[in-house]
């Protein structure tokens, strides 16, 4: 789950090229709104919010500086763009605000329910207490202990060498491909 501010950052991360025709950007705007509406219907609020923010940024911040919008020549696409600004943008701004409230509430709820670590890391320097030391019994013979470890290591190597020799598989008979012939006949058409 992402916060609305994180989603907004993602939404604003796209390339805009003012040399692309306005007609193509208007078609893109329609596609973005349709995809956002589909995401909202599927209860994917994060994706819907991201797409609506991208749409608003495209309409309000990027297309305003497009060369076809800034010309004095009236065109169908320029009128369509102003129609978007007048009719669609206010409605989408309202939808976006509602989604932002829902996303932030869900994000806050999840953030409050996330388990936090209570483990406190001990300092890097280890201090030993005399009570923490382990005292070996007086009957402990370190030389015998080392011999036992050595014998165990040697016997395990010997055992693994024996088990490897048991893994040999018998040779498989070879098939002679030249002695077998297969003929194919094509059916008459």
Swiss-Prot record:
Signal sequence region: none
The protein depicted here goes by the name Regulator of free ubiquitin chains 1
Q: What does this protein do?
A: Inhibitor of the DOA4 deubiquitinase involved in the regulation of protein degradation by the proteasome and maintenance of a normal level of free ubiquitin.
Source species: Kluyveromyces lactis (strain ATCC 8585 / CBS 2359 / DSM 70799 / NBRC 1267 / NRRL Y-1140 / WM37)
Q: Which GO terms describe its cellular component?
A: endosome
Q: What's the family?
A: Belongs to the RFU1 family.
- What residues form the membrane-spanning segments? none
Protein localization:
Endosome
């Amino acid at each position: 789950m992402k916060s609305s501010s994180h989603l907004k950052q993602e939404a604003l991360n796209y390339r805009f090229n003012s040399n692309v025709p306005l007609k193509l950007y208007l078609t893109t705007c329609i596609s973005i709104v349709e995809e956002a509406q589909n995401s909202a219907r599927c209860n994917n609020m994060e994706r819907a919010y991201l797409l609506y923010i991208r749409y608003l940024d495209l309409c309000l911040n990027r297309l305003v500086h497009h060369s076809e919008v800034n010309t004095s020549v009236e065109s169908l696409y320029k009128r369509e763009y102003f129609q978007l600004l007048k009719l669609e943008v206010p409605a989408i701004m309202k939808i976006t605000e509602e989604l932002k409230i829902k996303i932030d509430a869900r994000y806050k709820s999840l953030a409050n329910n996330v388990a936090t670590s209570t483990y406190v890391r001990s300092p890097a320097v280890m201090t030993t207490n005399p009570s923490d030391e382990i005292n070996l019994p007086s009957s402990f013979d370190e030389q015998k202990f080392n011999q036992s470890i050595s014998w165990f290591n040697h016997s395990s190597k010997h055992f693994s060498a024996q088990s490897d020799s048991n893994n040999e598989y018998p040779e498989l008979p070879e098939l002679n491909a030249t002695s077998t012939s297969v003929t194919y006949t094509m059916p008459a058409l």
